């Protein structure tokens, strides 16, 4: 059995369509403008390795020598119980937004925690991916009618990576 992205699942496994939602181009561009203007909370750094600098807009890791902007981002807005701001990266130069909406990005299959939230932006479930199969966790969360969206975060640093929604 295949989903719309062509991923093969065993016949006994249900497939649920989902959409990957990377950081918006508007937010990435605003971060670039703030860094260019010298905002103290928008730091421009140069990647010194191929790991450790994941762009939340194109959903790929920066290569050594690429310039990145490190800035605070709140995936859940202030005033909500689960509101939190944390550091994320985007490329300093414009990059193409990740567009494979029905396909989980290969670069982020390991070391992630998945958090399901309801329509009031309250966390209702969470699970760490063991191995490199996030799809069953995503599908389990999205099968719950109370789940409005899922956030994907780094296990080691807790940083926001992307959002996943039901199609």
Regions found by a protein language model. Give the residues of each.
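C-terminal edge-of-domain segments
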Residues: 160-167
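Short, hydrophobic/π-rich interface segment
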Residues: 113-149, 153, 166
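Short Gly/Ser/Thr- and Asp/Glu-enriched loop/turn motifs at secondary-structure junctions
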Residues: 155-159
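Conserved mixed alpha/beta catalytic, RNA-binding, or beta-rich assembly cores of soluble enzyme
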Residues: 33-110, 115-127
């Amino acid at each position: 059995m295949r989903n719309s992205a062509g991923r093969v699942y065993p016949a006994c496994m249900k497939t649920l369509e989902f959409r990957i939602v990377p950081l918006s181009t508007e937010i990435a561009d605003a971060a670039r403008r703030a860094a260019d203007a010298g905002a103290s909370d928008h730091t421009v750094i140069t990647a010194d390795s191929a790991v450790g600098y994941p762009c939340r807009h194109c959903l790929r890791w920066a290569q050594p020598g690429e310039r990145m902007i490190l800035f605070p981002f709140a995936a859940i807005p202030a005033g909500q119980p689960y509101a939190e701001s944390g550091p994320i990266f985007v490329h300093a130069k414009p990059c193409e937004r990740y567009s494979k909406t029905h396909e989980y990005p290969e670069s982020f299959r390991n070391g992630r925690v998945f958090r399901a939230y309801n329509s009031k932006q309250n966390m209702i479930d969470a699970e760490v991916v063991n191995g490199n199969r996030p799809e069953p966790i995503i599908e389990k969360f999205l099968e719950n009618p109370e789940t409005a969206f899922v956030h994907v975060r780094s296990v080691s640093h807790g940083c926001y990576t992307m959002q996943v929604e039901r199609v």
